[in-house]
A protein has these predicted regions:
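Short amphipathic alpha-helix used as the core "switch/output" element in two-component signaling
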Residues: 74-87, 105
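C-terminal output helix
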Residues: 101, 115-128
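Active-site residues of response regulator receiver
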Residues: 64-65, 95
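Receiver (REC) domain active-site loop signature in two-component systems and cognate sites
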Residues: 68
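Basic, Lys/Arg-enriched C-terminal extension of HTH/homeodomain DNA-binding domains
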Residues: 191-212
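Acidic catalytic/metal-coordinating carboxylates
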Residues: 37-38, 72-78, 201
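Acidic, metal-coordinating helix/loop segments flanking the phosphotransfer/catalytic sites
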Residues: 35-61
C-alpha cells in the first residue's frame, strides 16, 4: 500500500524506549506518527473538543500496549468499541508473551491484529500499512454514503418518483402513464435525476442505490 499523505499512526505505550523506536521505524518508512505515554493521555486526546493532530475523517491506526499504568490498553480498546471507531482507527496490540491470549481475544472482538514483543520491523510495518488501508477504505465508503444521502436529499418529490420507476426498468412512456404526466416531463425529470446523482444511465443509477 502507498499510505495516504494524511495518514497517521498513533503509538500508545508507557515505555519511552518503545515509543522512540517505533517512531523512528515509522519515520524511516515515511509514516507520520504521534506518540502518547498512556492510554489516559490518548483517551483525553480523542475526547478533546478541538484537536489539530487527527480527526475521524483522516486515515489512521493505533499501536496499543496491553499493560500500562492507569488505564490499560484493553480499557481504551473498550472505549473505541463503544464509539464504533475500530474500522476507522484499527488497533494493533503490542504485547509481551504473557499477554498473547488476551491479545488474541481482543482480535476476536475486533482488534486488527497483535504483534508480540520483540517484533519484526518489516512484519509490523506490513500490518500497519494494511490497517491504514482498512481505515482509508472505511472512510471512502462513509464519504460515498454521505454523498449519496446528500444527492437524494436534493431530489424533488417528483424526481424521486421518476427515479424509483426508472430503477424498476420502466420506459418513459409507462412512467408518464403511471405518474399522469407527459413523456417530455418524464424526460426532464429523468435528466435532472441523472445530473444530481452524477450518473449516466439507469443501470449506473440502480448500482449506486444498491451500493455497488
Amino acid at each position: 500500500m502507498q499510505p495516504s499523505e494524511d495518514a497517521l499512526v498513533f503509538i500508545v505505550d508507557d515505555d519511552a524506549g518503545v515509543r522512540e523506536a517505533l517512531a523512528w521505524l515509522l519515520r524511516s518508512r515515511r509514516l507520520p506518527s504521534e506518540s502518547f505515554d498512556s492510554a489516559d493521555a490518548f483517551a483525553a486526546f480523542l475526547n478533546a473538543s478541538s484537536r489539530s493532530a487527527w480527526c475521524p475523517s483522516q486515515p489512521g491506526c493505533l499501536l496499543l500496549d496491553v499493560r500500562m499504568p492507569g488505564m490499560s490498553g484493553l480499557a481504551l480498546f473498550e472505549q473505541l468499541i463503544e464509539r464504533q471507531l475500530l474500522n476507522v482507527l484499527p488497533v494493533i496490540f503490542l504485547t509481551g508473551h504473557a499477554d498473547v491470549p488476551t491479545a488474541v481475544d481482543a482480535v476476536k472482538r475486533g482488534a486488527f491484529d497483535f504483534c508480540e514483543k520483540p517484533f519484526s520491523d518489516n512484519a509490523l510495518v506490513d500490518r500497519i500499512e494494511q490497517a491504514l488501508q482498512r481505515s482509508a477504505t472505511t472512510l471512502q465508503v462513509q464519504r460515498a454514503k454521505q454523498t449519496l444521502q446528500q444527492s437524494l436529499a436534493d431530489l424533488t418529490e417528483r424526481e424521486r418518483d421518476v427515479m424509483r420507476l426508472v430503477v424498476e426498468g420502466l420506459p418513459n412512456k409507462l412512467i408518464a402513464d403511471q405518474l399522469d404526466i407527459s413523456v417530455r416531463t418524464v424526460e426532464v425529470h429523468r435528466a435532472r435525476v441523472f445530473e444530481k446523482m452524477a450518473v449516466k444511465s439507469a443501470v449506473e443509477l440502480a448500482n449506486l442505490l444498491r451500493g455497488e
